[in-house]
């Protein structure tokens, strides 16, 4: 029985956001029809407006979708504090705050539309300059930008019955359990730390420790691992019986980042379990969408 999976980092913090989201929607509209589960990283999630005002592709009747904010705990803390101080006005004040934040979203979107790739270049190549910029000139823009950042899992609701949850391990990840051809599947949507291999490796080990507590026949890890084939993360997975779908089908790792002249393979779909055949595995997308190539595959669950 065929299970089709797709992972893609949409990178809100990048140039030409207004143009890119149109292109992203066109790609996802087609992929929603052809995939059973789509996991997205760095998806843009408004606080008050419906998320399908940004991702029109999510209006498809074929799917259900579950977003989780990167800083969901912090956002919840703010709203809980409001409830404590103004218990009788909680609903009204929460609405007003979300309304204001969604207006700020317009400013944030414009900023990253015009300067996103410049910020990204400084972040990776001149971290001290980036830090000074972050702390002095544009702190509100960056802080608010992260408030709208999150992960999303899109599921073909006619084919898969599941509930998507999230857990924090230094960064949040999403996970869902479902039965497929009488096999217990556990799938995780992952976005590991980009700051260092050490941090990402610690997060991965916590994720694996968590999945070991959940009964399953097949484990699927999909997302942006921010880890090259020479990393501790990659070595750990290959040494623990995980298979990269791209490597298995093409006998090599295919570079996924950046989208223009890719330098490294950091986006993967990893599988572990018996009675799974990789029917196909490919990368897709270009710089008109985001700075990451996406990965998709078809698995035959026997």
Please provide the spans of the model-predicted regions.
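Active-site regions of metal-assisted phosphoester/phosphodiester hydrolases
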Residues: 1-32, 37, 45-56, 60-70, ...
């Amino acid at each position: 029985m065929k299970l089709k999976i797709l992972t893609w980092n949409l990178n809100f913090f990048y140039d030409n956001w207004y143009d890119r989201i149109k292109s992203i929607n066109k790609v996802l509209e087609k992929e929603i029809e052809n995939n059973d589960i789509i996991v997205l990283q760095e998806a843009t999630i408004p606080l008050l407006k419906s998320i399908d005002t940004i991702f029109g592709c999510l209006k498809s009747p074929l799917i259900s979708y579950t977003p989780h904010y990167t800083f969901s705990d912090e956002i919840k803390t703010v709203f809980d504090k409001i409830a404590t101080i103004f218990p009788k006005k909680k609903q009204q004040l929460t609405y007003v705050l979300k309304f204001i934040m969604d207006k700020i979203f317009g400013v944030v979107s414009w900023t990253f539309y015009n300067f996103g790739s410049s910020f990204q270049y400084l972040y990776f190549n001149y971290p001290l300059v980036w830090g000074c910029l972050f702390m002095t000139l544009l702190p509100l823009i960056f802080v608010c930008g992260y408030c709208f950042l999150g992960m999303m899992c899109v599921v073909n609701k006619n084919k898969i019955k599941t509930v998507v949850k999230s857990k924090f391990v230094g960064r949040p990840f999403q996970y869902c359990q479902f039965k497929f051809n009488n096999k217990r599947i556990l799938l995780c949507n992952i976005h590991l730390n980009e700051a260092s291999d050490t941090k990402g490796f610690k997060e991965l080990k916590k994720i694996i420790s968590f999945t070991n507590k959940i009964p399953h026949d097949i484990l699927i890890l999909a997302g942006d691992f921010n880890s090259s084939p020479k990393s501790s993360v990659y070595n750990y997975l290959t040494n623990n019986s995980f298979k990269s779908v791209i490597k298995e089908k093409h006998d090599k790792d295919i570079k996924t980042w950046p989208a223009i002249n890719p330098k490294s393979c950091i986006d993967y779909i990893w599988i572990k379990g018996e009675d799974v055949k990789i029917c196909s595995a490919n990368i897709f997308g270009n710089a008109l969408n985001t700075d990451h190539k996406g990965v998709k595959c078809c698995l035959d669950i026997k």
